Amino acid sequence: MKIVREALAGTQESSDLMVKIAPADGELEIVIHSEVIKQFGDQIRQVVNETLHALAVRQGLIIVEDKGALDCVIRARLQSAVLRAAEEQPIDWSKMS
């Protein structure tokens, strides 16, 4: 999916996260800020990468402000933000699990 506009999803509340997406030329840039980065940073990055790969996002700036969200919340917030920021196109719902 091509990112064409800025979008937000999520909150700054405990056990949630805020995802900010913006269009950018070049490669995909992912920035993760988390209160639990030392314990779960690798897992958070893996979930973010897998979700973006499943949605075929190859360019853009993705900023994740995590407050201890579970993997399912990370996926849901990323999916919401990407769909808000992407070009209008048919969605393959089978890729969103």
Curated annotation (Swiss-Prot):
Cellular localisation: Cytoplasm
GO cellular component: cytoplasm
InterPro entries referenced in this protein's UniProt entry, alphabetically: CitD, Mal_deCO2ase/Cit_lyase_ACP
Keyword annotations: Cytoplasm, Phosphoprotein
Residues found modified as O-(phosphoribosyl dephospho-coenzyme A)serine: 14
Highest taxon, organism lineage: Bacteria
Pfam families attached to this UniProt entry: ACP
Transmembrane residue ranges: none
Entry-linked HAMAP family: CitD (MF_00805)
Subunit note: Oligomer with a subunit composition of (alpha,beta,gamma)6.
Family: Belongs to the CitD family.
Chain's role: Covalent carrier of the coenzyme of citrate lyase.
Alphabetical list of NCBIfam families matching this protein: citD, PRK13253.1
Protein name: Citrate lyase acyl carrier protein
Species of the source: Enterobacter sp. (strain 638)
Organism lineage string: Bacteria, Pseudomonadati, Pseudomonadota, Gammaproteobacteria, Enterobacterales
Gene: citD
